[in-house]
């Protein structure tokens, strides 16, 4: 087994003191030292360190400065394509800034969120990026009270005073509804959740506004489904919409879109022949349908980049002018998904 190279080994090989090697390596910034040290001596020490394949003890260095070099990221459901894509990009960002990431999922459970927060804090994370779930705001409030750097993404808690990265949900839902109206649809029903999450409520607001401005206020209908038992209710919601003469559906999430379109097909209807469909987010499950729909491509890469930038600056103690970053999506119209089966 290869023996780990230490600072003493470098000092002995370079013919300098251990203190000088420690000083150079500790204050290294992008190949240069933060303080004035003879350039030739610095270059010599770094060359020897490279030849010996020296690997710094990141944990020890972080402990010295009170940092773990780890950021905790908590999603509502990391298996959701949108969140898993963000997770992938966050990993890429973490490599760029030289930190490690701990991931967790709450399954929309505030109890699980609380436990994950406690675990991550006990592990010494430097900061947290969280998709908050429905429930008491005490968990988020406690993080703020403990002065732990925090960034919320995708959604916020009521009255949250801190940093966040969110989508322009109301404007996006307005635009989706407007696209359906432009196709000639008048009885557009929205399928949403019973949860009082800020992003869901904002999407409902955007739908309402578009319908009202089009003179369709009397046609506004929002069917709300429980998050954990959607399949048991979606068929009845779709059937009632059909009985009311609905000609289009706006789905608040990609999961609802898959479940809703499945119910439409199960009941013998076609998209877009019988119903136009619009939804938030792309989902690979769309590939099993032979449909055309309007959907939102949320900027997962921007969510990752902006949240990592914000949390890194908070950890570094920088004063940030922007606390709430609102992202704009790309709307894909008439995207066609052909069946693979």
Which stretches of residues belong to each language-model region?
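Alpha-helical recognition/docking segments in bacterial nutrient-uptake
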Residues: 1-2, 6, 65-178, 182, ...
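Hydrophobic beta-strand scaffold residues
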Residues: 18, 101, 150-151, 218, ...
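Flexible loop/turn connectors
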Residues: 165, 169, 219, 231, ...
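An alpha-beta-alpha
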Residues: 176-216, 323-338
């Amino acid at each position: 087994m290869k023996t780990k190279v230490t600072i003493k080994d470098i000092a002995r090989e370079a013919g300098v003191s251990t203190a000088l090697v420690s000083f150079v390596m500790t204050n290294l910034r992008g190949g240069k030292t933060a303080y004035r040290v003879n350039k030739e001596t610095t270059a010599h020490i770094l060359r020897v360190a490279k030849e010996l394949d020296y690997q710094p003890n990141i944990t020890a260095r972080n402990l010295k400065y009170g940092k773990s070099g780890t950021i905790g990221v908590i999603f509502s459901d990391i298996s959701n394509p949108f969140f898993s894509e963000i997770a992938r990009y966050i990993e890429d960002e973490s490599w760029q800034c030289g930190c490690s990431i701990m991931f967790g999922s709450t399954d929309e459970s505030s109890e699980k969120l609380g436990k994950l927060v406690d675990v991550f804090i006990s592990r010494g994370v430097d900061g947290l990026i969280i998709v908050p779930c429905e429930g008491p705001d005490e968990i988020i409030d406690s993080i703020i009270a403990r002065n732990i750097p925090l960034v919320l993404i995708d959604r916020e808690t009521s009255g949250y005073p801190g940093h966040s990265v969110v989508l322009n949900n109301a404007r996006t839902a307005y635009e989706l509804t407007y696209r359906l109206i432009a196709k000639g649809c008048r009885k557009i029903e929205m399928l949403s959740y019973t949860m009082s999450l800020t992003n869901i409520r904002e999407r409902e607001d955007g739908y309402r506004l578009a319908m009202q401005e089009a003179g369709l206020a009397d046609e506004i209908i929002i069917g709300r489904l429980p998050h954990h038992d959607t399949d048991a209710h979606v068929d009845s919601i779709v059937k009632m919409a059909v009985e009311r003469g609905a000609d289009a559906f706006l789905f608040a999430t990609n999961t609802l879109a898959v479940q809703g379109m499945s119910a439409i097909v199960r009941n013998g209807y076609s998209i877009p022949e019988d119903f136009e469909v619009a939804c938030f987010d792309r989902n690979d499950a769309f590939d099993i349908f032979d449909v055309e729909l309007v959907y939102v491509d949320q900027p997962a890469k921007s969510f990752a980049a902006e949240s990592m930038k914000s949390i890194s600056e908070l950890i570094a103690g920088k004063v940030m002018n922007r606390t709430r970053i609102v992202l704009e999506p790309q709307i894909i119209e008439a995207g066609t998904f052909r069946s693979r089966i």
